[in-house]
Structure formats: C-alpha cells, structure tokens
C-alpha cells in the first residue's frame, strides 16, 4: 500500500470537508448580518424584472448557493408571497450571484513568488481572529463578523489542502487522459458537472473543486467549459427536490430554474463545441482558476441578458409542463381537507426555514395578518351588536375559526424558528411574538363572545336606548383605533403608535367606567330593563378587555425599543 497516496487522499477529503464547512459558516454569518434587509430586498421585486435580477444576485452572493436561493423562491411562491413573473428574475440573478465564490477561490492561484499575498498564507490567522470574536465577543455583530472571518479562513485552508494533496500527481497520465475524454465528449462533461453539484448541493462548491484542479494545471479548457455548464444545471436539483408537495406555481418556479439553465447550457455548449472544432489548441489549453471564474461569470451574465426579455415565455413554458389540476382533482383536494387550513400550511412553508432571517420576517408578517383578522372580528362583532346583523355574526364565527388556525400554525412555526441559528435580538422578537399571538387570539375570542351577545339580543328582541347605542358606538370606535394602533406598533416597530395605544387604553378605561355608571343610573331610574342592562354591561366589559390586550401588544414593543437602547 502506498502510504503517501493514502495520506494525500485523506488530505483531499479533509480539504473538501474544510472547504464546504468554511463556506457554510461564512454564508451563515453573512446571512445573519443581512438580517431583516432580506425582507426589504424581496419588497423591491414588485417593481421590475431588472431589480428582481439584482436582488437575486445579491441574495445568492450572501448565501453562496443559487440552489438555496431558488429553494427560498419556491417557498415564497408556494406561500403566495411572490408571483412567477417576479420569481423568474430572482432565479436569473441567482446564477450571477453564485459566481462570487469562484472569484474568491481564484485568489488562491497567486504564485509562490508572491506567497505573502496568497489567501492561504493568512488563512490560519483569519481562523484564529474569527474564533476569538465568536468565543469571547459579547456583541452579536462582532460574533457574526467572527463567523464570516472563520468561514473565509477555513475555505482557503480547505482549498490549500486539496491543492497540496493533488500537486504530486499533476503529471500523472490519468489526469490528462480523463480530461481529454471529458473535453471530447460534451455530454459526459455536463453529466459530471450535474452529478457532482447534485451531491454537494451547491454549484459554488463544485466550481471551487474544479478550480482547485485547475490551479494544479490539470484541467483543459474544453473539459472545464462543459463541466461548468453541467454544474449550472446541477444547481437546479435542490430546488426540484424541495418543490415536492408544493403548489403548482411553486413547482413551476423550480421548473423555470431548470429551463433557464438547460437553455443556457444548450446555447453555450453548442457554441463552445463548434469553437473548439475550429480551434483545437484552445480546447486542450490548460485553463487557470481565474479563467474559470471569468467564463463562469461571463456565461451567467450573457445568459441572463439574453433570456431576461423572454421571462414571460419561461413562465408560459413552465405552465405547459406543470399543468393546472383538473376540476375533479381540485374538488377531491378540497374535500380532503379544510381549504383555509391547506392555505395556511402553504403560508408556513418549511423551505423558508432554510433562510433564518427571512423566516423571522415571515413570522412577523404572519402575526400581523393574524392581528388584522382579529381587528376585522372586532368590527364584525360591533356591527352585529349595533345593527342586529346575523350575517355579521356568521362572519365573526368564520373569522374566529381562521384566527384559531393561525394560532395553531403560528405557534408551531415560531417554535421551529426559535430553534434556528438566529441572533439574540431575533430570539427576543420571536418570544414577544409568542405573547402577541396569545393576545391577538384572545381579542378574537372576545369578539366571538360579543357576537353571542348580539345573537342573544336578536333572539330576545332586546333594544338599547338611543343614549346606550351612542355610548357603545363611542367606546367601540376607541377600541378599534386602539387595537389598530397596536397592530401598527408591532408591524412598524413604532414607539409613536405604541404610545398612542397606551394613551387610548387609558381613555377606554375611563370611558368604560363612566358609561357603566351612567347605565347603572338609567337602571336605577327605570329607564332601562334589567335584562337589557346586563347585556349592555357585558358588552362594555368585553370592549374594555379588548383594549387591555392591545395594551399588552404595545407594552412588548416598548420593552423591545428600551432593550435596543
């Protein structure tokens, strides 16, 4: 047994592991640093396709994987946060963003003459500095910076290990023969690229390994071109797998990614094959790591430029491939489950959890949606009482069912998000959101209780006096404004809105006490029937409790603002 060969194989395997782990740590740190900016970037998608491309490129540059970005897009489309037209731009941009890693890796080709400039020279120092920041720094931002630095250091150490383990064998005939076969057979090269990328689940990682081989001068241009084209197609595998069990549109998003990359590979692969036929010297030229970076970037930018005007065509093609359900299938699906529960299950798509910062933003967005449902229920219940409206009573019951489902799904989702790798600040937000959904659900319960009183009022033909109706209108309007401001404070993280809630809640308490005393006077003077009076006082009490829950929401926001200071 050749001990040296075994040792080099171990070194190569360790190098791959270190490279992949370093890239993962670096991406995780960058993603945490990006935080809620992810949500703002997604908001830009509604403007135009060019901005969507830029956003896709930026997000992928952060998370270092076009496949991961597309998985996130599949999750957004599945949850109804993004249309297919918006998604196609992000998918195109993702292919550009993933080339950043290739440029970082290409720095490793700096020669021994300038060893002091080689990233691997500084890699151990980077790991050391990063580890100190992660282990001993108390500030979250410094810890994130430490993760990024450690990741970069490990990435370059891994590349150096791989390069060093291969260097003794660069003159071996097996390398030249292997790349000669791959270069002369485009389909084989593309297949190798697809398989390696599918296994590693990252085109950035597979391109990095190819560049390591190129640094040692064993990769021919034709082989590199075809393998790179395959790597682009291989990056689609992650999204395709993740689209299983999603909506038709989510499957179409994954399909568009595949169509886009296959189209690019066909166009460039055909062109490259023809070029190499007329320029055989170029085909067998040993490509450098930097040249792979140039080709990788050039290929993706040109493909995006060519295909961008045909984004709508990609959407149509994906619709032809992934057809709508037939009417019978749709009916069977609806009969199988609660349609609103099915819709909510798509809202809380587990694919979004792969991007923790986005998952946190999604949690907040869903809490706001739940809050607005409870706000609607306050309005419905007030209308039911004021107008003896049976339709409004039915609406309250329907909305309360939705709020209960939201509480169930949101609680499960928040538990999952809280277990992700998120910042301390995000953990505090998630804990407050747990409290928020309890208050929001209780408000909807109170609305249902008030609708029960409205039903009792209708069935027993109870009529409030004109004074009583005016008093209820005045109090209910304040409660609606109070809860609306509480939702605004939670959504916008607004101190002004939170202070408004506290002020209005005090006014509600004072007004409720005043109206209660006035009504007791009317009961004492015989202007109101005792049976009517009990219902009226119960409604006052319910409205006051609703404002208490609004105040709880505002107090959480004010506490978060104080904590930040």
Each language-model region and where it sits:
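Interfacial loop-to-helix junctions that mark the boundaries of transmembrane helices
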Residues: 1-10, 110-122, 145, 176-182, ...
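Short helix-coil transition sites and intra-membrane helix breaks within transmembrane domains
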Residues: 16, 27-31, 60-68, 164-167, ...
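Cytosolic, long alpha-helical scaffolding segments
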Residues: 82, 108, 219, 245-251, ...
